[in-house]
Curated annotation (Swiss-Prot):
This is Large ribosomal subunit protein uL22. This protein binds specifically to 23S rRNA; its binding is stimulated by other ribosomal proteins, e.g. L4, L17, and L20. It is important during the early stages of 50S assembly. It makes multiple contacts with different domains of the 23S rRNA in the assembled 50S subunit and ribosome. The globular domain of the protein is located near the polypeptide exit tunnel on the outside of the subunit, while an extended beta-hairpin is found that lines the wall of the exit tunnel in the center of the 70S ribosome. InterPro entries: Ribosomal_uL22, Ribosomal_uL22_bac/chlpt-type, Ribosomal_uL22_bac/org-type, Ribosomal_uL22_CS, Ribosomal_uL22_sf. GO terms for molecular function: rRNA binding; structural constituent of ribosome. NCBIfam families: rplV_bact. GO terms for biological process: translation. One of its GO terms (cellular component) is cytosolic large ribosomal subunit. It comes from Alkalilimnicola ehrlichii (strain ATCC BAA-1101 / DSM 17681 / MLHE-1). Keywords: Ribonucleoprotein, Ribosomal protein, RNA-binding, rRNA-binding. Belongs to the universal ribosomal protein uL22 family. The gene is rplV. Part of the 50S ribosomal subunit. The lineage of its organism: Bacteria, Pseudomonadati, Pseudomonadota, Gammaproteobacteria, Chromatiales.
Length: 111
């Protein structure tokens, strides 16, 4: 049984979020949570919250055994960009793109 959780419009660059997502893909949930807890990256705390939510969904909705869960799929999609302007010399301006992410975590019981 697979259960998932999504976080949309997270103010985090998809490139940075994917670095953390790649570290926990395919691991047992317990080990993945340990890795995320001790990672110094901002993305680790955000991904950890989504993983906790997926585990809670599996336990509450499907009655899954938490000890038997693993991270079946985790992927980060790009969300809409917030466009900001940085003033430059001589009346010019540069555009700054504040990127957002959609993070999806799917957990499943190990076979």
């Amino acid at each position: 049984m697979e259960t998932s959780a999504k976080l949309k419009f997270s103010r985090l660059s998809p490139q940075k979020a994917r670095l953390v997502a790649d570290q926990v893909r395919g691991l047992p949930v317990e080990k993945a949570l340990e890795i995320l807890e001790f990672s110094p990256k901002k993305a680790a705390a955000i991904v950890r919250k989504v993983l906790d939510s997926a585990v809670a969904n599996a336990e509450h909705n499907d009655g899954a055994d938490i000890d038997a869960l693993r991270v079946a799929r985790i992927f980060v999609d790009e969300g809409p960009m917030l466009k900001r302007i940085r003033p430059r010399a001589k009346g010019r301006a540069n555009r700054i793109l504040k990127r957002t992410s959609h993070i999806t975590v799917t957990v499943a019981e190990q076979q």
